[in-house]
């Protein structure tokens, strides 16, 4: 499955717009990691724990979005956007949204 933030796929023509698809991931962060991330932020370093959580959430959300597109018979998802939100109690939500399309290779 091709996923792209652009509105076209190089070397292909979009033959059908199947619909809007999305995927979500809600991740928990533990208290020790939150505390250590806070120390890292105060010192001015990067928080690897949060970066890892963001990457994991992104992968899950994109995979779920692609699975939904495949269920609709799509070849690709274009115009992909990612959104991250911090929820209460240390929860992190990642949402991937895009348009599922059918493609034909240009000759």
From Swiss-Prot:
One Pfam family from the record: YbjQ_1
Segments crossing the lipid bilayer: none
InterPro entries xref list: UPF0145_dom_sf, UPF0145_YbjQ-like
Domain of life: Bacteria
Listed PANTHER family: UPF0145 PROTEIN YBJQ
HAMAP family linked: UPF0145 (MF_00338)
Family stated for the protein in its record: Belongs to the UPF0145 family.
Name of this chain's protein: UPF0145 protein BH1111
Organism: Halalkalibacterium halodurans (strain ATCC BAA-125 / DSM 18197 / FERM 7344 / JCM 9153 / C-125) (Bacillus halodurans)
